[in-house]
Amino acid sequence: MEKEVATDPLPQEIPSDAPDEGGSLSRPAANTWTVVSLTIALCLGVFCMSLDVTIITTAIPRITDQFDSLDDIGWYGSSYLLTNCATTLAFGKFYTFYSTKWVYLSALFLFEVGSLVCGVTPTSVGLILGRCIAGLGAGGLFSGSLLIIAQTVPLHRRPVFTALLGSMYGIASVAGPPLGGALTDRVSWRWCFYINLPIGAVTAAFVLFFFHAPNSVKRRPELRKLLSELDPIGSFFFLPAIVCLLLALQWGGTQYSWKSPRIIVLFVLTGVLLLAFVAVQIRQNEKATLPPRIVQNRNIWSSAWFAITLNGAYFVFIYYLPIWFQAIKAASATKSGVMNLPSIIAVVVVSIISGMLVTIFGYYNPVMIMSSVTLSIGAGLLSTLKTDSGSGEWIGYQILMGLGVGLGMQQPFMVVQNVLPDGDVPTGTAVITFAQTLGGAIFISVGQNIFQNQFAHTMHLEDPSVNVATVLSAGTTTLRKYLPAEQLPAVLRSYNTAITQAFYVGVALASLSCIGTIALEWKSVKKPRNTTPNDHSGS
């Protein structure tokens, strides 16, 4: 098949044909204003897609009241994560073969359509559908943002910009619940979704007018061959496997017993479908969603391992720390967000500093090692919180945890850009993005199971007269309002035990992230690298 040059409909600055200092392919000489404008726009886009994970949490009570849909609560969150995970790798293929700009704008359009559907829907089913559509688009936003930065900024300067994009996850995770609560109380829960529309419009405008992709050789498959290039057989096995896994983790131990046929079948299907997916990837070779030569690269699988463990640990803490503040310290949704600021400030500041360190010294390995060690210490200390722990403890422990996350969160993306040829960077970026998203989705569910089961067990030991279902349905912020004074201490101790047991998941993951750092090669981002795009013909 002939190769054609991917051109951009907008005028481009004249690029230099010489490699930049980092050894990457030539790119347009973007000026400071262009880089700053694009960075702000992309940060807003990542902020919105990250905000959608947490902003709905404080709006759910009002939504279920309006739709009388208590049974649908789990789907409001999982539907977004499911489709997000399911499309991340597929977007890697799109970014490989087609214009980064237009694939990104298409993903953003899908996300915006989903947000609009969520805002205007008159039914609970419509809300779930809107969340699914938004998740489809979200699967291509973060990886697309990283690729736009990669095509605008030289390799040795990218760590800072990559860190800025990654810090949006932390900011959104803390801002989501109080912002959702404020919008729900003062306007309507529908504005939790409408808020994405103007922000998305700004992002789209900036990307449309300021991003001029470098001249690059990309093979654009004919429409009739597009399906084979997108690995439909692999997707046929992979997408249901992810759905089965997340459903099993969400339902197991809560809605259904772990020994129930439904959960067992879901786990068995997950295993069978994943094995079939692996077989298809080996057979498809270069046309696979995950080409074996990329997955077998030790830097890629070790970075993916680091990403899934670090993000899994981080999501456990950002999900359950607000619950600890609301239940144990009687904080409102807004105040719990403020009490979470030590960790988020640490993540944001240290993410930027870590990017500078990699830029200055050229190596990400020491930063990732420090990340694993610091996160493990901070996670371990957070798991020791008691009902009478003072502010010095929960502030200090959060800072340590945030330092660990900030140091390591964006380094896997630098690994991808440093060790893979430019033609493989979209696929490698999608692999890391998928690992991060899947880590959050899986281990939030694992933490939820541990929390609910441990709370029921501990509550039975502390005070068998307390109705566990009633306490959980009452919510963390109303415990003191509805519980008799004599039952409150036992309930608080049970809450504390259950939450810190969930924190053990984060401790284990933080410790396991060390495996990824040990397996990485030491390769400087300042040295020239192989930038020849691979032939994706698969022949």
Swiss-Prot record:
The keyword Coiled coil does not apply. Keywords: Membrane, Transmembrane, Transmembrane helix. PROSITE patterns: MFS, SUGAR_TRANSPORT_2. Disruption phenotype: Does not affect the biosynthesis of roquefortine C and meleagrin. Induction: Expression is decreased in presence of phenylacetic acid (PAA). InterPro entries: MFS, MFS_dom, MFS_trans_sf, Sugar_transporter_CS. The indole alkaloid meleagrin was shown to be a good candidate to control c-Met-dependent breast cancer proliferation, migration and invasion. The chain crosses the membrane at residues 36-56, 108-128, 133-153, 160-180, 191-211, 233-253, 262-282, 305-325, 338-360, 362-384, 395-415, 502-522. It is found in: Membrane. It is a multi-pass membrane protein. Pfam families: MFS_1. One of its GO terms (cellular component) is plasma membrane. GO terms for molecular function: transmembrane transporter activity. Residues 1-25 are annotated as: Disordered. Efflux pump; part of the gene cluster that mediates the biosynthesis of the mycotoxins roquefortine C and meleagrin. Belongs to the major facilitator superfamily. TCR/Tet family. This is Efflux pump roqT.
